[in-house]
Design a protein with these regions (language model features):
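Generic hydrophobic transmembrane alpha-helix motif, especially the helices
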Residues: 105-143, 154, 195-199
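Short membrane-interfacial helix/loop motifs at transmembrane-helix boundaries
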Residues: 4, 25-59, 124, 219-221, ...
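Membrane-embedded alpha-helices of multi-pass transport/permease systems
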Residues: 25-28, 32, 81-85, 119, ...
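Interhelical loop and adjacent transmembrane-helix boundary motif
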Residues: 3-8, 39, 52-61, 209-262, ...
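Transmembrane alpha-helix signature in integral membrane proteins
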Residues: 35, 59-90
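N-terminal signal-anchor/first transmembrane alpha helix
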Residues: 1-29, 102
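Transmembrane alpha-helices
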Residues: 14-15, 20-27, 155-160, 166-167, ...
Length: 281
């Protein structure tokens, strides 16, 4: 079947430019105004790094940043482990009794409203506190557990899609040569799905760092995450420190994303070369 001819129209370019402008112009304005010396975020008064200094001297903001980064890193790591296990069970173990129910329970958080998830987890923690005395109070631990709950679903979907694309002949050949299933997974399967694991980890980290609704339900008075602090601040007006913080986050996310993309692309190319070399041999 011949490919359909590409219809060149100026309207397509206009729509594309408008779409990118709508997406990235606010970010550009945010970065520019983070260097504004004025206290009023909408009034330009000259270039300055004043608000970056104020940001690092704000103990409440730095505490919230540290808490959010810690929770996000720990939640993403646990979600990557649990999501990998869940994906292997869904894809490699095939049909078993209760497989449909298992897959539904793993992926249900994807379509569950955050309000429902947060409220249900709050009721669970309260009930456990009355029944067994744990958790004694809500804070970093309960936020971490809540984030692991919904992040695992996203990681499982990412990794399961990668597992379905793999050529199982290499795994079967290794088992024919006497390798145990556990050794095959760690030596062959895991390196091949590592780009998906890294992608799932980054996705879980971003979702955890960005979460406001669920964390608001399961946190206590002594645990304030960065989205909660920013949300409470902007309700009384945008603080220029928030512009500086958002600019730093954009920069870090961009650098980390580029490094992850580069490493995954290089790993994937090396994997393809190794497979081709093995088939020639």
């Amino acid at each position: 079947m011949n490919n359909l001819p590409l219809i060149r129209s100026p309207w397509r370019i206009v729509i594309l430019v408008l779409g990118f402008t709508f997406l990235y112009a606010p970010m550009l304005m945010l970065v520019i105004y983070s260097f504004n010396s004025s206290k009023l975020v909408t009034v330009w008064a000259g270039w300055s790094t004043r608000w970056y200094g104020e940001l690092f001297r704000d103990s409440a903001m730095m505490s919230a940043v540290g808490l959010s980064l810690t929770i996000a890193a720990c939640a993403a790591t646990m979600a990557a482990i649990l999501g990998t296990i869940a994906a292997v069970v869904m894809v490699r173990f095939g049909r078993f009794r209760g497989s449909n129910g298992f897959a539904f329970m793993i992926t249900a958080p994807l379509v569950m409203p955050d309000v429902i998830t947060g409220l249900s987890l709050l009721l669970l923690f309260v009930a456990l506190g009355h029944a067994i005395g744990w958790p004694s109070d809500r804070g970093m631990l309960t936020i971490w557990l809540a984030h692991v709950t919904f992040c695992t679903a996203y990681v499982a979907v990412v990794i399961s899609s990668r597992l379905r694309e793999l050529d199982r002949s290499i795994e079967e050949a290794a088992m024919d040569l006497g390798a145990t299933p556990l050794k095959v997974f760690f030596v062959i399967t895991l390196p091949m799905i590592m780009p998906a694991v890294v992608s799932g980890w980054l996705l879980a980290f971003t979702l955890s760092l960005d979460d406001l609704v669920i964390a608001s339900f399961v946190s206590g008075p002594g645990a304030t995450t960065l989205p909660m602090l920013v949300f409470s601040s902007v309700r009384m007006g945008v603080n220029p420190e928030i512009n500086a913080l958002a600019t730093l986050i954009l920069g870090v996310v961009g650098i980390v994303g580029f490094i992850a993309w580069y490493l995954m692309a290089r790993t994937e190319k090396q994997r393809i070369r190794d497979i081709q070399r093995a088939r020639r041999d």
